[in-house]
């Protein structure tokens, strides 16, 4: 019996898969729903690669950007609102997407942070799925995935062979892609692909003015952290304030080096695109790390793009990965303890570990592709990770790194000269806005 099962499984794996078969399965899945499937044809094209036809269930627009894939089984609202996906077309490997709908983006937690999203809007410019669920069920859901995409102006295509797309990207490497709705594919339009890597995407997602999020009212004398916003996720801010820290968030190019002495710690956030676009941020960090002896013990923590910017500030280099790491189940080894952690990741660039200066050593390593996942200073309280300890979505194995960082911040504050309070004026801080400023998505650079 087991031999027969194995033989049938082998036959199924070797059977040819066509776009037509996926379109049929899409129609069969959605036909049982309460809403009708869109009859509008759509095309997903990889530059210099295959063309996939399907059905549109999002906004009626043509978009172009970097095609990337995520293997996360859940968490599509969090992924789609993650600013690190700005300018990208997100391919989901999970076969059925949208079955638990989309929660409200207006609900907030006790700190005033968005409860279910990682930013106020969808950040990817398009999504590609095998099956899109038109029937959804969850107690937090207020609309379907398709309705959300239409309202946010995001192109979405279903009924395509996502396994073939991922296989191509994995073997050929990162590629530009385009979603066309209601039009036939025209090979002469291949020159119309837009490369978001040539755009400073951080400028698009960073707050335009400083804003402040206070710790809980019952926290006495809270720590005060300066956050450099390169596209910070809501759950990163929540991970800090829920541990008793007040945070002031600054635009990515803000001269933080001029006011760093007012804070108990510096944090550099995640964000989209090529880290070399953020030259001023790198110079500001380098000034804090190497040119201000009075800040030599100031704790600094960076995540994702923040990790890469810290590495650049230290004199290291970054490289573009073949197809990036975007998943919720990537093993990372802590080189200081020998422990393995399952991590959430979303990045297309990595730090070249061979270029790290002598004062830094590798902190974590990716056990899948051996790429660098973090660095730590040999003497100062400075460390960073390529993965996301805050998850959302994904495991919380490494959330203890926030505790480690805030422990260093507590030590730094305690060691400061007694009787000298250099922290920002509380009245001025309280007058700051309480949320991101000027990051509304009113125009895309990559919509044709």
Swiss-Prot record:
Reaction(s) this enzyme catalyzes, per UniProt: hydrogencarbonate + L-glutamine + 2 ATP + H2O = carbamoyl phosphate + L-glutamate + 2 ADP + phosphate + 2 H(+)
Entry-linked Pfam families: CPSase_sm_chain, GATase
CDD domains: GATase1_CPSase
Listed PROSITE patterns: GATASE_TYPE_1
SMART domains named among the record's database cross-references: CPSase_sm_chain
Gene Ontology CC: carbamoyl-phosphate synthase complex; cytoplasm; mitochondrial matrix
Highest taxon of source: Eukaryota
Enzyme class: ligase
The protein's annotated pathway: Amino-acid biosynthesis; L-arginine biosynthesis; carbamoyl phosphate from bicarbonate: step 1/1
Disulfide bond entries: none
Keywords: Amino-acid biosynthesis, Arginine biosynthesis, ATP-binding, Glutamine amidotransferase, Ligase, Mitochondrion, Nucleotide-binding, Transit peptide
Transit peptide residues according to the UniProt entry: 1-27
E.C. no: 6.3.5.5
Active site (record annotation): 304, 388, 390
GO biological process: 'de novo' pyrimidine nucleobase biosynthetic process; glutamine metabolic process; L-arginine biosynthetic process; pyrimidine nucleotide biosynthetic process
Annotated compartments: Mitochondrion matrix
Recorded GO MF terms: ATP binding; carbamoyl-phosphate synthase (glutamine-hydrolyzing) activity; glutaminase activity
Occurrences of domain Glutamine amidotransferase type-1 (ranges): 224-415
Cross-referenced SUPFAM superfamilies: Carbamoyl phosphate synthetase, small subunit N-terminal domain (SSF52021), Class I glutamine amidotransferase-like (SSF52317)
Family named by the database record: Belongs to the CarA family.
Function, in words: Small subunit of the arginine-specific carbamoyl phosphate synthase (CPSase). CPSase catalyzes the formation of carbamoyl phosphate from the ammonia moiety of glutamine, carbonate, and phosphate donated by ATP, the first step of the arginine biosynthetic pathway. The small subunit (glutamine amidotransferase) binds and cleaves glutamine to supply the large subunit with the substrate ammonia.
NCBIfam families: CPSaseIIsmall, PRK12838.1
Assembly notes: Heterodimer composed of 2 chains; the small (or glutamine) chain promotes the hydrolysis of glutamine to ammonia, which is used by the large (or ammonia) chain to synthesize carbamoyl phosphate.
Protein name stated in the entry: Carbamoyl phosphate synthase arginine-specific small chain
Organism of derivation: Yarrowia lipolytica (strain CLIB 122 / E 150) (Yeast)
């Amino acid at each position: 019996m087991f031999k027969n099962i194995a033989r049938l499984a082998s036959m199924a794996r070797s059977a040819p898969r066509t776009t037509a078969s996926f379109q049929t399965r899409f129609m069969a899945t959605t036909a049982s729903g309460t809403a009708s499937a869109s009859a509008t044809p759509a095309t997903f094209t990889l530059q210099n690669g295959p063309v996939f036809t399907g059905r549109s269930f999002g906004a009626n627009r043509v978009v172009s950007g970097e095609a990337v894939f995520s293997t996360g089984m859940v968490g599509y609202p969090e992924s789609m609102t993650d600013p690190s996906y700005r300018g990208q077309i997100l391919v989901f490997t999970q076969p059925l997407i949208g079955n638990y709908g989309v929660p409200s983006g207006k609900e907030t937690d006790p700190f005033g942070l968005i409860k279910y999203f990682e930013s106020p809007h969808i950040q990817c410019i398009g999504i590609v799925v095998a099956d899109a669920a038109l029937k959804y069920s969850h107690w937090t859901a207020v609309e379907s995935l398709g309705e959300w995409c239409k309202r946010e102006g995001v192109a979405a295509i279903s009924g395509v062979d996502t396994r073939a797309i991922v296989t191509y990207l994995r073997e050929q490497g990162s590629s530009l892609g385009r979603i066309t709705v209601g039009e036939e594919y025209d090979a002469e339009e291949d020159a119309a692909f837009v490369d978001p890597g040539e755009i400073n995407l951080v400028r698009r997602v960073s707050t335009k003015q400083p804003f402040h999020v206070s710790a809980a009212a019952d926290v006495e004398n809270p720590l005060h952290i300066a956050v450099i916003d390169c596209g910070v996720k809501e759950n990163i801010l929540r991970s800090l304030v829920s541990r008793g820290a007040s945070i002031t968030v600054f635009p990515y190019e803000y001269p933080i080096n001029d006011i760093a002495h007012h804070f108990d710690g510096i944090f550099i956030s995640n964000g989209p695109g090529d880290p070399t676009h953020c030259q001023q941020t790198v110079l500001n960090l380098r000034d804090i790390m190497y040119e201000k002896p009075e800040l030599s013990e100031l704790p600094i923590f960076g995540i994702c793009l923040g990790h890469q910017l810290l590495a650049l500030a230290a004199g290291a280099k970054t490289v573009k990965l073949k197809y990036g790491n975007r998943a919720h189940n990537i093993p990372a080894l802590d080189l200081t303890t020998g422990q393995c952690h399952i991590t959430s990741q979303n990045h297309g660039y990595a730090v070249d570990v061979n270029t790290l200066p002598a004062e830094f050593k590798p902190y974590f390593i990716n056990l899948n592709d051996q790429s660098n996942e973090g660095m730590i200073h040999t003497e100062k309280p400075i460390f960073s990770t390529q993965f996301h300890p805050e998850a959302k979505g994904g495991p919380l194995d490494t959330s203890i790194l926030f505790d480690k960082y805030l422990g260093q911040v507590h030590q730094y504050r305690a060691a400061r000269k007694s009787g000298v309070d250099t922290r920002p004026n509380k009245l001025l801080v309280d007058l700051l806005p309480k949320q991101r400023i000027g990051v509304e998505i009113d125009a895309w650079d990559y919509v044709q």
